[in-house]
């Protein structure tokens, strides 16, 4: 069963009641909300996502709701909560949707320590994955969005989830939040992309969410083997450069980029070492998405041979 | 400790502090010399020179002293009178 099997009214009742149980890759969430505007958008953008089995345990109980007490009358706000705690200051109610999406990422980044969490986008094709470790603003979400609308499967735009047992990457194909100029870039690059409304003046500027292609969502339980690290950086008007990186440098860039390298101790060292040993690593500077996608297509085709 | 060598760069994971260090070849080889037990500073220097493939005395005293001081600062080795040992 998927979210789209529920009517808008049924979805709203679940959100306002015991919560909407939703499966995002390896995580089961239960989402509650008493905000009508959130319910409408969730129905549209979460439409193809699966509902877990009734007996499945929820990893996170999250909510995005109007605050209680006097505050709710003073100003229309939305509070993100997890397991009954409210870790962030209230958001403008108009920003409830991105606030929940950020909150879910925060839950993964701070709690899912049974996995190595790389701050990285990831895509897969023919069983081989590219990881894009990057800092905010380096263009990893934009590049990732372009690739998943060009024949690659989305693993995640935010997390490289590495399973310690075998080093495989677990998909987490959630909505991709594009920021500012990237929104228009993707609208032009792939007009058919499903993009939600633009939220103006959020804490991260203008944000709009891209729904991943259906194939990525349907294959969310299919792990992938990491094959390449590509460290992207978007530089306006720059000619494309794509250069191999020494493994020692790649190791440091991956390790320092992980959310929980220190938490996982020697396990993280072993996992990063194994990945860097097996993967080829490159730096990519780009300004043109078509050029970048072509370069990575060629890399993938060469890797097949 | 866990080791990973790439080219002439050594990456070392120190379980006692959960820190990962990046060492050049000389520093890493000094540390490796001490993995089997304490040694005098002279012996460590001699074994390091042999591992580096240079002749006795060719590793500058200042370079050796700097590397051992750095390892000691990181809590990876300690000086025991005339000998060095892994902590």
Where are the regions that the model predicts?
Chain A
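Charged, amphipathic alpha-helical linker segments immediately N-terminal to NTP-binding catalytic cores
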Residues: 57-107
């Amino acid at each position: 069963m998927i979210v789209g099997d529920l009517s808008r009214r049924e979805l709203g009742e679940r959100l306002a009641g015991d919560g909407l149980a939703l499966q995002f890759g390896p995580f089961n969430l239960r989402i509650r909300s008493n905000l009508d505007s959130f319910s409408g958008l969730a129905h549209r953008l979460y439409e193809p996502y699966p509902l877990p089995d009734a007996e499945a345990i929820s990893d996170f109980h999250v909510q995005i709701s109007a605050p209680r007490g006097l505050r709710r009358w003073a100003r229309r706000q939305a509070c993100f909560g997890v397991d009954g705690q409210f870790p962030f200051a209230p958001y403008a109610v108009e920003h409830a949707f991105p606030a929940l999406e950020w909150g879910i990422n925060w839950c993964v980044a701070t709690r899912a320590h049974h996995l190595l969490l790389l701050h990285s986008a990831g895509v897969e094709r023919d069983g081989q994955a590219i990881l894009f470790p990057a800092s905010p603003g380096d263009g990893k979400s934009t590049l990732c969005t372009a690739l998943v609308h060009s024949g690659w499967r989305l693993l995640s735009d935010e997390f490289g989830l590495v399973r310690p047992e075998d080093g495989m990457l677990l998909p987490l194909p959630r909505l991709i939040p594009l920021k500012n100029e990237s929104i228009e870039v993707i609208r032009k690059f792939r007009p058919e992309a499903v993009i939600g409304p633009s939220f103006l003046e959020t804490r991260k500027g203008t944000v709009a969410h891209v729904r991943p292609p259906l194939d990525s969502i349907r294959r969310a339980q299919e792990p992938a083997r990491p094959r390449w690290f590509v460290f992207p950086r978007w530089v306006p008007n720059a000619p494309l450069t794509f250069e191999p990186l020494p493994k020692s440098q790649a190791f440091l860039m991956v390790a320092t980029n992980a959310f929980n390298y220190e938490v996982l101790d020697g396990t993280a060292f072993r996992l990063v070492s194994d990945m860097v040993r097996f993967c080829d690593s490159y730096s990519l500077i780009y300004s043109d998405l078509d050029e970048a996608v072509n370069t990575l297509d060629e890399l993938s085709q060469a890797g097949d041979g | 400790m866990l080791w990973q060598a790439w080219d002439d760069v050594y990456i070392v994971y120190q379980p006692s502090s959960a820190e990962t260090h990046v060492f050049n070849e000389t520093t890493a080889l000094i540390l490796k010399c001490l993995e089997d037990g304490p040694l005098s500073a002279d012996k460590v220097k001699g074994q390091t020179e042999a591992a580096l493939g240079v002749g006795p005395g060719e590793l500058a005293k200042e370079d050796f002293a700097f590397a051992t001081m750095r390892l000691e600062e990181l809590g990876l080795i300690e000086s025991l009178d005339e000998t060095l040992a892994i902590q």
